[in-house]
Swiss-Prot record:
Part of the RFC clamp loader complex which loads the PCNA sliding clamp onto DNA. The complex possesses DNA-dependent ATPase activity which is further stimulated by PCNA. The keyword Nucleotide-binding applies. ATP binds at residues 43-50. Belongs to the activator 1 small subunits family. RfcL subfamily. SMART domains: AAA. This is Replication factor C large subunit. The gene is rfcL.
Amino acid sequence: MLWVEKYRPKTLEEVVADKSIITRVIKWAKSWKRGSKPLLLAGPPGVGKTSLALALANTMGWEAVELNASDQRSWRVIERIVGEGAFNETISDEGEFLSSRIGKLKLIILDEVDNIHKKEDVGGEAALIRLIKRKPAQPLILIANDPYKLSPELRNLCEMINFKRLTKQQVARVLERIALKEGIKVDKSVLLKIAENAGGDLRAAINDFQALAEGKEELKPEDVFLTKRTQEKDIFRVMQMIFKTKNPAVYNEAMLLDESPEDVIHWVDENLPLEYSGVELVNAYEALSRADIFLGRVRRRQFYRLWKYASYLMTVGVQQMKEEPKKGFTRYRRPAVWQMLFQLRQKREMTRKILEKIGKYSHLSMRKARTEMFPVIKLLLKELDVDKAATIAAFYEFTKEELEFLVGEKGDEIWKYVEKHGMHRIEDETFLESFVKAEKEEKEESVEEVAEEKPEEEREEPRARKKAGKNLTLDSFFS
């Protein structure tokens, strides 16, 4: 079991933080009522923000519901889960929120909230702001490493508490308590060295301490070879440890990665067939599938403590399924699924931009733009001549990339025509007006060309007929 979880504080007294922070948090919790501002706990990683929130829930007798913003990329998902959790009273075993007359308060903890401000999370912050303005009936704590990635509006809606990096003495005291409980003999200078290398990150220090002390009854100064903690361990090195060794310490190495278990399982899945075959491959995939089951439970129930079981199965579980490591160099590959997901994300983003233009200039909702106009416009661009298709492209102000996305190579031809003729959209002109206007201009040009080729007397005849027929009714044209 990871020591980070094993020795996570259960009460506020066990949390390593300034007394002023603990006092403010207790005051907020005891005075909380519907409409109270959420707490925004801000500070660098490993200073106890999440631990404090969980300890607060335990102290107050509240049920803690943990969400991780970096793993719930869709703002709709965040709004559904946080919204339902904030406005209902109980949670089922399957992780679904249920309405109930009897139930205790739930402390909703949204971690890594500064990550929903990225491009792939468009709308996430807006959804959160809407939720807070609705005055949820449950206490809400937001956690961020960098609060200034959030908009001023969101920060102003919260009561912000800033955490400072822990001193190496504070970190060393925690490590000393863990060493005592684990029965490990260790000099205080060694603990101070580990604490210094962690740079004020208590979680990192505990992970380093566990990795160094694994299987030892005593930790000596010469065992601490760290010069500076590597913040981002090499994923390729972890792959080598899984496939080329039978050392169970790979689990600790994997937990130090700046990769989530969802990322690591893709790496293992991609490279497993390069190293294993036959029965070994079957057994390794069995371990990997069990890891995936735990990850699925994490996604459904938002219970991130199950990550450790998934991580163990995808590293040590897969590693121990081989009789002997395969010799020789293996070039490990990045997960192919990432490229596919990236392409799908690009496709969705391009479609969204096109639909926004169609909706804007056709005065339609996004839904109607998608279901009614998008297929028609795509067909017209494909089937019409380049000059007519260019009229549509100019009207909707499609870019070259958007045209190529819609009709492939023809999109480049359409774009060149638009550029060559300086075509642009006329404000307040409807699509039908624009298209009819282009058709009319083309017919007039055609009539003028034909007229120039006719003799003078033939050109005069239509004018006389037009003059004589000014007062004729419509029926007279067919008599």
